[in-house]
């Protein structure tokens, strides 16, 4: 593959710092991996999550077994806005359009048997982003 098209001379509107770094090096204007998609395909992921953590875990494992290389976690509405599943305002919404996550135990079950250091994960999160990210990081640390 011809990579000369992306040299600083070929892209004059970029600053030297933006255009001169090779792929995989700061400032990552040419990608985060040294060979990018020539050596590693993009992540294949399906937006999924429903019911409880165990049901969603079964779905994620199935998707990975079928060739998926990443996960896109769909959280239910109560989780996205910060309500526990037993909160009165969550009634009728728990697990309907995504997985219900109320605790670190739920997050551990969600990713049980899935090596987070081997699978890229995206999460559609709103106001509770910092809480769910903290639970995700704690789960990853528990896995080692």
Please place each PLM-identified region on the residue numbering.
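Catalytic alpha/beta active-site cores
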Residues: 1-143
């Amino acid at each position: 593959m011809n990579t000369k098209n992306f040299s600083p001379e070929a892209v004059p509107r970029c600053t030297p710092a933006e255009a001169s770094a090779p792929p995989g090096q700061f400032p990552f204007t040419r990608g985060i991996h040294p060979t990018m998609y020539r050596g590693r395909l993009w992540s294949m992921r399906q937006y999924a999550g429903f019911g409880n953590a165990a049901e969603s875990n079964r779905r994620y494992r199935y998707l990975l077994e079928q060739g998926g290389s990443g996960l896109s976690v769909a959280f239910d509405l109560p989780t996205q806005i910060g309500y526990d599943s037993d909160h009165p305002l969550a009634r009728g919404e728990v697990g309907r359009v995504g997985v219900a996550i109320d605790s670190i135990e739920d997050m551990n079950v969600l990713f049980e048997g899935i090596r987070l250091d081997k699978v890229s994960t995206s999460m559609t999160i709103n106001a509770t982003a910092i809480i769910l990210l903290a639970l995700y990081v704690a789960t990853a640390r528990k896995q080692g």
